[in-house]
Amino acid sequence: MTTSKQSLFTHPIHLGLGATAIAQPEMTGMEFYAAYSERTASDGVEGRLVSMYRFDESWDSWEMHPSGDEVVLLVEGSMTLLQEMPDGSVATTILGPGDYAINAPGVWHTADVTEPATALFITAGLGTDHRPR
């Protein structure tokens, strides 16, 4: 299916079974994710959400994806990714434009932002959890 041009900032893409790429409805905040999970549940752990965000400040929570890897690709600016490892240690990775990091399944992660940053995410979102920072 061919769709008209969309902005990844407002309309994420679902990568699904059978090598499909499905444009998603407009991102509306946290309620988007609940509806997305329902729409794509039949893809199970193989489904991926491709999204892009601009950050002007550090994240206020940690998140974790238990079902698969998440790719974080920095497009612009600078971001420090913090990953809480299974042994409790925290790995720190500074990302610049074009750099990427992978959040492994079950690894809690957050980010510090000291200048505006834009990042692209490819997320195995099934079962994603959040906790306060």
Task: Mark where each language-model region is.
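A short, N-terminal "cap"/entry segment at the start of jelly-roll beta-barrel domains
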Residues: 1-61
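Short, charged/polar surface micro-motifs in flexible loops or helix N-caps
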Residues: 45-46, 55-59, 78-80, 87, ...
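Short, surface-exposed beta-edge/turn micro-motifs
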Residues: 47, 68-71, 117
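Short glycine/proline-enriched turns and hinge-like loops at secondary-structure junctions
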Residues: 65, 86, 113-115
